[in-house]
Amino acid sequence: MSKDKITPLVDYSSSETSSSDGWCDEGKEVFVDDFADKPMDMGHVSGGWAGHVYLVVKESAGLRRISQACIEEICQRSDDAGTGKAETVECGQTSVIKEADIRSRVRRMEGLHVSLTRVFYLQEHEISGFVEILERAVLASSHGAFAVGFSKASMYANETGSREFVGLDIGSGEERLAKIVGAVDEVMRRFGKEPFFSNPRFHVSIVRAERGKGGRGMIGKGLGQAMHEEILALPAVQISQLECVFGNRRFCIAL
């Protein structure tokens, strides 16, 4: 991502350089998110189990529609820009063909969620105690289910730059999220783990894209104004469940 400025997930003021159409244009800020697709990919490592705490976001018809529209626009822009084309040489002649796997590298995210922790590690004998303390802390601070609304879309990437994401930034409901993060942070500190970012960018990643050949990004241009207006018009989504995963072990806490 030589043209992109990659910054940590920070507070919303850091996103002011984003384009007016609601998504970072090429050369603008790209926010680091190294756990957008982690819940299903983590497992046991020597010395501990990888953990992640997040709030479950139920996929609505509106989110599915926006996700698919983003995929279509990304693929179309990549094709128009030549990202989805490759040169081949046959019988001494060079031809340009469309890469067969362009769509396979851009896909809708499953298991939509809002992260509340970084990835952390616990010993197996610590897991049950952690979950019990986490449940008490969260229930004392969450005050039941609540709704969140979306303000705009931003471009995110993992730290290695191998994957990019379209994330819907959360606007309404941010205060409730901050209270829950505060409770989770206290539990993390109790177990000697690093708390979440001090001013997190709460978001839901809806589309992921693998980097193309030669490190070319699949996501690099802004969404159109019409798409931005659709995002703003999305109904609020209900948050009613927190999950904590350690490898293939999943613990659910109803708010």
Question: What does each model-found stretch correspond to?
Answer:
Residues S2-L255:
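Histidine-dependent nucleotide/RNA phosphoesterase domain, centered on the 2H-phosphoesterase fold
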